[in-house]
Regions:
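NAD(P)H-binding Rossmann-fold N-terminus in SDR/SDR-like oxidoreductases
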Residues: 97
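Generic low-polarity alpha-helical segments
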Residues: 1-11, 30, 43, 59, ...
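Domain-scale recognition of functional cores that engage charged ligands
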Residues: 64-86, 92, 100-423, 427, ...
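C-terminal catalytic/acceptor-binding lobe
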Residues: 395-476
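Generic structural signal of hydrophobic/aromatic residues within well-ordered alpha-helices
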Residues: 19, 23, 40-43, 76, ...
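Low-complexity, highly charged intrinsically disordered N-terminal segments
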Residues: 1-70
């Protein structure tokens, strides 16, 4: 059985059937009838484990396609200037590891060093650090934090992470247009963006962009999607179901997102994607969205937490490489970076699978008992989709693998939640993995420990020639 992606409801119904199928395969029909959530939670690593994980081989840096720093970028520049690249911004994340709310809206200019220490302490507590280690964090001086940030947080231009993300792309495209003797405003009007937000902030953020004249973009070229959240799944007397209402008929407070894989699949639902025209949402049918995708030479999917993006949103070498690989019939290009040696973090990692005789990107929750420090080549979460329609159509036909987890909801009870991942598209289509000659460590804002480097990245962004003036152009 496969996921049915025609609508929100068909996704829900087919996902229940697939989870049941997976549990019966693991436990057997008779044990499944008496199965409890506690038993599922106890075996969750084994349930999610990638098949043959024990035989997977580590991939060496030299075994990955190295991006040529001297690659001809003229086709890449032309594709951007003509509006033939779709810029996708995945900004629905709720920063659960940081515990600070929707990441898009975070404005670090409102922080101070006491707040940063608080973030570091909260993270240490969550990780179960010793009292001695926590006390060391409490004793970190403002002077040390300032050295790491290279400024006071209040010195930053007062912008949310999301606005910084959008503005950097506008800034870089304008610079590219000027270098090529093009009128920047006209080039910006040709650009197409797809912005994915969560239910709690979608209205606020989309209206903010509309109020700021879409940062110079044509409203017809800006698509939005509100990633849906889901009630928790309960197992009772051998039956799985989305547990939506209590005995008094009130909606349960147990909704969570189904990870970025569901976000990708939701694009294929009817009436899920919309434009804002004359202040109103105008929804697209699936066929309208597919038609919208037809002209693109590449879709680039950005993750809002990538910090290198804040001073260089356009990677011409990477785009040029993706376009070349697209001509070689690759439908997905994933960039690989090194692990953070100072604070190894979880994430998708590259391995060679001897069963299917190719490299695969495997998400961390499928890696069974591998530790973070065992993960060497990580997914940068910066993906290209040359031949964009091919990967989208394949996704509709097959759906993504369904991992799941048992988590506590806001109502204090535990439920099953699905956690499909975007990167698993690499199992559906011909995928190329690329990296740099000099393997750089992953550089993002996933954890509290990375907050000072995030302030620094924002400070570096503010120092770019003309960036402050661009923010003023839009009244920010």
């Amino acid at each position: 059985m496969k996921l049915d992606l025609k609508s929100f409801e068909t996704y829900k119904n087919s996902s229940i059937s697939l989870i049941k199928e997976k549990l019966i395969e693991f436990y057997g029909q008779e044990r499944f009838k008496k199965l409890t959530l506690a038993q599922i939670k106890e075996n969750i690593k084994a349930l999610n484990a990638y098949p043959g994980i024990e035989d997977m081989k580590e991939v060496e840096h030299n075994d990955v396609h190295i991006i040529d720093e001297n690659v001809n970028t003229s086709k890449a520049e032309e594709a951007i200037l003509n509006g033939n690249v779709l810029w996708e911004h995945a900004a629905a994340g709720e920063a659960t590891r940081l515990g600070l709310g929707t990441k898009y809206l975070l404005d670090l200019s409102k922080f101070n060093f006491s707040k940063i220490r608080e973030v570091l302490i909260n993270e240490a507590v969550k990780e179960g650090k010793s009292e001695e280690e926590i006390n060391k964090i409490k004793e970190i001086k403002d002077r040390q934090l300032k050295e790491e940030c290279e400024c006071e947080p209040s010195d930053l231009i007062p912008l949310s992470l999301g606005l910084r993300h959008m503005l950097q792309l506008i800034y870089d495209i304008r610079k590219l247009a000027e270098r090529n003797g093009k009128y920047a405003d006209k080039v910006i009007k040709k650009q197409k963006m797809f912005i994915i937000l969560n239910e709690s902030t979608c209205d606020e953020i989309s209206k903010e962009l509309a109020a700021n004249n879409f940062l110079g973009l044509n409203p017809e070229n800006v698509l939005f999607m509100e990633q849906k959240s889901f009630h928790g799944i309960t197992l009772r007397k051998g039956e799985l179901f989305y547990d939506e209402m209590d005995s008094d008929g009130n909606e349960k407070n147990n909704k969570r997102l189904h990870n970025h894989g569901q976000m990708v699949m939701q694009k294929l639902h009817n009436d899920s994607i919309f434009r804002i025209l004359d202040g109103e949402r105008k929804y697209l049918k699936r066929e309208e969205f597919l038609k919208f995708l037809e002209p693109f030479k590449d879709m680039i999917s950005y993750n809002i937490e990538d910090l290198s993006y804040l001073t260089s949103s356009i990677d011409l070498q990477s785009l040029a490489t993706a376009l070349e690989l697209g001509e070689e019939r690759y439908d997905m290009v994933m960039e690989v970076v090194g692990q953070n040696p100072k604070k190894p973090q979880k994430g998708a990692s590259l391995f060679f699978d001897p069963r299917i005789k190719k490299n695969v990107m495997v998400e961390s929750f499928r890696l069974f008992n591998l530790k973070n420090e065992d993960l060497k080549l990580m997914n940068k979460n910066f993906n290209h989709y040359p031949n964009t329609l091919n990967s989208i159509k394949k996704l509709f036909e097959e759906g993504l693998p369904l991992g799941f987890e048992v988590k506590e909801a806001a109502d204090g009870k535990e439920y099953i939640y699905l956690c499909p991942v975007q990167g698993d598209i690499n199992f559906l289509v011909n995928t190329a993995f690329v990296t740099r000659k000099e393997l750089k460590p992953i550089y993002n804002w996933k954890t509290g420990a990375q907050t000072t480097q995030t302030v620094k990245a924002m400070h570096d962004q503010d120092k770019q020639e003309g960036f402050k003036e661009l923010t003023k152009k839009f009244g920010l």
